[in-house]
């Protein structure tokens, strides 16, 4: 089944899970698409089975809190940031609920975490205005970049380069093997006083970069030239909430939730809005991602919703 405007318009909520007492701040699909794991402001980690459509387990990180949860490549392991006490990143085995390693270094809250798609490298960005490069096998930071403002960061799909968004006005591209030489490309964007960048994502084909903001718009940027291709708006975000925007796995569409529980979908090429879907969420949709392997996506406020298409194309 191929994703088309019609298929996207046909998506409906198939299941809603009420496992959390506070907002879900992040979730991540496993590379196989078989499970999704969420972190929440209620300090819980919930693992869901996507095929059976049910929660499998709940773990807690009461002391440190949990945010920015990411699967690693090893089965049943995740990394996540703390959102209270300290700013150490933790590497957890879900199998026995034990920490494998800690990654200390950041002196302020971690605001972005990106796992390399190909190996054990990951990068983190913090309000301490640094990006750190790590290897899961060592607690020591493998690389450090001091930046001129609040950063966001992400690996490209090949794991060869990473992008840093700095101070909501600049995108810098680094080669992983020679990042200490500085960025090989810098794209200056129009600065917007009304909001700040909250995340940066590459499309799966590596050609596009999506800049999310805590305002009422998103920017789609050509990953090679740095030109803004489209600015997407027309969704509600009056309270400056961090809303997650995502590409579909075929790199053809972009989706974002809104504060009124609706999901807006645009075509990347034409820039046209193709669908507005009502998730009937009780609060702002803080997290939204398409499954990397199956024709389903998930959205979350304090509830988690699984969506399925209702037509067979």
Swiss-Prot record:
Q: Which Pfam families does its entry note?
A: WD40
One Gene Ontology molecular-function label: chromatin binding
Which keywords are on file for this protein? Chromosome, Cytoplasm, Nucleus, Repeat, Transcription, Transcription regulation, Transcription termination, WD repeat
Where is it found, in Gene Ontology cellular component terms? chromosome; PTW/PP1 phosphatase complex; Set1C/COMPASS complex
InterPro entries in the record, alphabetically? G-protein_beta_WD-40_rep, Swd2/WDR82, WD40/YVTN_repeat-like_dom_sf, WD40_repeat_dom_sf, WD40_rpt
The record's WD repeats, renumbered to this chain, cover: 19-58, 105-144, 146-184, 192-231, 236-276, 280-313
Q: Which domain of life is it from?
A: Eukaryota
A single GO BP term for this record reads: RNA polymerase II promoter clearance
Question: What does the UniProt entry say about where the protein is found?
Answer: Nucleus; Chromosome; Cytoplasm
UniProt-listed PROSITE patterns: WD_REPEATS_1 (PS00678), WD_REPEATS_2 (PS50082), WD_REPEATS_REGION (PS50294)
Query: What does the subunit section of this Swiss-Prot or TrEMBL entry state?
Result: Component of the SET1/COMPASS complex. Component of the PNUTS-PP1 phosphatase complex.
Similarity comment: family membership: Belongs to the WD repeat SWD2 family.
What is the protein's known function?
Regulatory component of the SET1/COMPASS complex implicated in the tethering of this complex to transcriptional start sites of active genes. Facilitates histone H3 'Lys-4' methylation (H3K4me) via recruitment of the SETD1A or SETD1B to the 'Ser-5' phosphorylated C-terminal domain (CTD) of RNA polymerase II large subunit (POLR2A). Component of the PNUTS-PP1 protein phosphatase complex, a protein phosphatase 1 (PP1) complex that promotes RNA polymerase II transcription pause-release, allowing transcription elongation.
What protein name does the entry list? WD repeat-containing protein 82-A
- Species for this entry: Xenopus laevis
Q: Which gene encodes it?
A: wdr82-a
